[in-house]
Design a protein with these regions (language model features):
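Polar, glycine-rich mid-to-C-terminal structural blocks
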Residues: 213-277
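Acidic/histidine-rich catalytic neighborhood of metal-dependent amide-processing enzymes
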Residues: 117, 122-199, 461-462
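A common structural junction motif
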Residues: 87-88, 240, 244, 349-358
Length: 462
């Protein structure tokens, strides 16, 4: 019987090639033009779970893209781990900023990944990290090392807000019964510094539309006499932060819980170089809410950011018009206790109230979700900590993530289960950005570490 380390070493080329093949499929859930590719990816995941040793695998249809469910129940008296991941990916735009085509994976060395990293859309978020669990399952079943029951729930709509997952989970509570939920869709502090994500921010995502005249107008004939929707929109957006970068929406901070000085001091122990941070982003200064560090701003504090803005003429050359409409997409990252639906309504009310005369404003809510905190005294956290210690040789550092996985709070509500976030990516892996990548070392280390979580969770649960 092989150890997991030797099994991974013996099969690393195959593991890598399988992931590369998966990354070649453009499973972009946000674009209907890629529907066939998303469905193809679901089929590939189904086959992979079957080969990995699941006794039962099915493609569960939804009103959108399907959920791939798989399980191996060895003894109903043993604990059950539910693995969640997603096979859909973000759109790759802007394509001109990629150094290589986003769905033609290439391996290149980087400063943080001297062993090489796979560059492709979905490499880290989440195909690479999701597939670690499939290969870990393969090892455990092939070597009779699976110590408990396991269920897989891999969806194809995470990047569009998991719009059909809530209904599926609510309708399949008994089927999805588990003792802990395991997700790898987060990151580590550094390649040699393992960490467990203990908190996620919530999310409220909206689109705003400002309408002025009933058609585009000649800027010479009408400029200065009619409200310009683009000018109005940019001014309204600028007013959403004050001079200290606090968000000005009334009631926005009412339910924000401030961390104690002791908790902030614990956060500050995580290794962080501000100079390296700025260098990696090619910026000469950081920005954010006054009174907080960079790590605090992007994890324990709520934010409001414009994700896209457009209107008027943006083609080549000049066209002197006053646009009839202007648009923006805005996301608000929220901290635990902030309800995303309440925040959405607060934003909508405020944004509509600050519109000047001469324009009409429409706010359209999109998706959202609640924040989440994992208790560090839970069995799942302790098992994850022991697993990282086993393979990295050091105890992982708990950290709050600035990102959002809205379904985590849904799982706790519907399934009454805690979620453990065992991520192996790095913040510098450029998820959602051009040149997304995932270190080969990280990928293989994830496969090596996950079986230890199964072992320790089963032991601690008894």
């Amino acid at each position: 019987m092989k150890t997991v380390q030797s099994y991974v070493n013996d099969n690393k080329d195959r593991f890598l090639n399988e992931l590369i093949d998966l990354l070649k499929i453009p499973s972009i859930s946000a674009d209907s033009a890629y529907k066939a590719d998303v469905l193809k990816t679901a089929d590939v995941i189904k086959t992979s779970l079957e080969k990995a040793g699941c006794d039962h695998v099915e493609i569960c249809e939804t009103e959108g893209f399907p959920i791939v469910y798989g399980e191996k129940i060895i003894d109903k008296n043993l604990p059950t781990i539910l693995v969640y991941g997603h096979y859909d990916v973000q759109p790759p735009d802007p394509l001109d900023l990629w150094n290589s085509p986003p769905f033609e994976p290439v391996i290149q060395k980087t400063e943080l990944h001297p062993e090489g990293a796979i560059f492709a859309r979905g490499a880290c978020d989440d195909k690479g990290q999701m597939y670690m669990h499939v290969k870990a399952m393969e090892y455990m079943t092939a070597n009779n090392e699976l110590p408990c029951n396991v269920k897989f729930m891999i969806e194809g709509e995470e990047e569009v807000g998991s719009i059909n997952l809530a209904k599926y989970v609510a309708s399949n509570r008994e089927k999805l019964t588990n003792d802990v939920i395991l997700i790898s869709d987060t990151g580590m502090i550094a390649p040699d510094v393992p960490s467990i994500t203990t908190g996620l921010r919530g999310l409220s995502y909206v689109e705003v539309e400002v309408t002025g005249p009933n058609r585009d107008l000649h800027s010479g004939l009408y400029g200065g006499a009619v409200a310009n929707p683009i000018n109005v929109l940019t001014k309204m957006i600028a007013s959403l932060h004050d001079e200290n970068n606090h968000i000005t929406v009334p009631g926005f901070y009412d339910k924000v819980e401030n961390l104690s000085d002791a908790e902030r001091a614990e956060m500050a122990k995580a290794p962080f170089s501000l100079d390296a941070y700025k260098k990696a982003l090619d910026i000469d200064a950081v920005y954010g809410e006054e009174g907080y560090t960079t790590n605090e701003r992007n994890s324990i504090r709520p934010t409001l950011d414009v994700n896209g803005i457009w209107g008027g003429y943006t083609g080549e050359g000049a066209k002197t018009v006053i646009a009839s409409k202007a648009y923006a997409k805005i996301s608000m990252r929220l901290v635990p206790n902030q309800d995303w639906e309440d925040i959405t309504e607060l934003f909508k009310t405020h944004f509509e109230s600050i519109a000047p005369k001469g324009v009409k404003v429409k706010v359209t809510p999109h998706h959202g979700g609640q924040g989440y905190v994992t208790p560090i005294d839970s069995i799942g956290y302790k098992a994850a900590s022991k697993a990282y210690k086993q393979t990295f040789g050091k105890t992982p550092i708990p950290q709050r993530s600035g990102g959002s996985i809205p379904i985590v709070s849904l799982f706790e509500k519907e399934l009454k289960s805690k979620t453990i976030l065992m991520g192996f990516g790095l913040d510098s892996d450029a998820i959602h950005s051009p040149n997304e990548h995932f270190g080969i070392w990280n990928y293989l280390k994830g496969i090596e570490t996950i079986p230890w979580f199964y072992k320790y969770f089963t032991e601690l649960k008894k």
